[in-house]
């Protein structure tokens, strides 16, 4: 299940807490139910879980952190598995390198395997860019940078789910929550453009010349 906390007290101490970057963590995430397009994600509380609130896999850049995770599921059925997640230290999105592999084990003994690629199924949590199966649905300023989480959906076979397994590949992979449910269209948040300053246009030295308007329109010959 969950293997670390949203908050990190000390950067690079190899003890984890999100991506082990100190204050550049996800402690701003409020515990409780976060609804995304009607999809409920249960955000756990670090204070109540003993610091085991989310799943973070270190990848090559945090090789000392856990690289695999197993999340038991109590034989729940759902048409889709939804992840609320992000990645860190991603290769360029256009390369679509594999952030990790997602396995869904069913009660009947079968398994589904999904290759989760940055630039398609997940995105860099420090950037606002969304992709085909990585919809930007949450963002906040964590006193270091503006960070985001993305919702992704993976179509399941149909039998009850026994467990979800995750393995890191080319980048760190952070899963804040996951849920099973019916097919739902995920709506993302839009980028907001803000101006740092406002400017007043300089006064004109002289009025602009008036445009002479002709009463008869002229055809344009192409």
What are these model-predicted stretches?
Residues 1-222:
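N-terminal/edge-of-domain interface segments
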